[in-house]
Amino acid sequence: MGQPRAIGIIPDGNRRWASLRGENLYIAYYTGYRNVKRILTYIRDFYPAIRSVYLYVLSRDNCSKRSRAELSILYRIMRRSIERDIAEIEKGGASLVIVGDINHPNLPDNIRESLAPYHFDMYLKKGSLPDGRRVVAGLCYDPFWEIEHYTPKTLPSRLLDEIDLVIRTGGEKRLSSFFPLLTRYAELYFIDKLWPDFTREDLDRAVQWFSTRRRPMGR
């Protein structure tokens, strides 16, 4: 088995990283955000076979149940970086696709407005998804919302690439509703490291592990 064409990343463990180091949540989430950028750049430069990267930014439960204080930290980081990060993704030859309920009442208007042009719904209105490499971000994402919001023919999970490899940091061994229709045959790689400590070498090990897997995929 060669390299995966689509990988999913569940970047878990930012809060525990803060607690273990005696840092505040802003430092933890900002460090985690910087690591997302580092890993995306590494994939772009050294893994040309990977065409899609799926990131679990926030589940719909996260958007509904996390404290206002914690969400405000996350949104503050997002507001500071959205335009610059989108420009970097596009400069690197990829397209951003947002999947999830960006009309969620807990999502700030300015973030919603900045991300709306890149939402899956906007691509549907244009008639097609962007070709080439993609960064797919799950924001206020929930599979039940997806099924209720779209027709069977326009489900994101029908039109996006199926995920070959899911990497979850932080030691938890579950998917937490991470694109369940796209992970039917995904290989699941769990690592105890907390997300801010995840390195490029850890990614290399995950991809190498994937290459050893036998994947009958129902056959």
From Swiss-Prot:
It catalyses: geranylgeranyl diphosphate + 7 isopentenyl diphosphate = tri-trans,hepta-cis-undecaprenyl diphosphate + 7 diphosphate. Keywords: Magnesium, Metal-binding, Transferase. Mg(2+) binds at residues 12, 187. It holds the Pfam family Prenyltransf. InterPro entries: UPP_synth-like, UPP_synth-like_CS, UPP_synth-like_sf. Substrate binds at residues 13-17, 59-61, 66, 168, 174-176. GO terms for biological process: polyprenol biosynthetic process. Gene3D superfamilies: Decaprenyl diphosphate synthase-like. Its EC number is 2.5.1.89. The active site is at residues 12, 62. Binds 2 magnesium ions per subunit. Its cofactor is Mg(2+). The keyword Transferase applies. It is an enzyme of class 2 (transferase). One of its GO terms (molecular function) is magnesium ion binding. It comes from the Archaea. Belongs to the UPP synthase family. Catalyzes the sequential condensation of isopentenyl diphosphate (IPP) with geranylgeranyl diphosphate (GGPP) to yield (2Z,6Z,10Z,14Z,18Z,22Z,26Z,30E,34E,38E)-undecaprenyl diphosphate (tritrans,heptacis-UPP). It is probably the precursor of glycosyl carrier lipids. Homodimer. This is Tritrans,polycis-undecaprenyl-diphosphate synthase (geranylgeranyl-diphosphate specific).
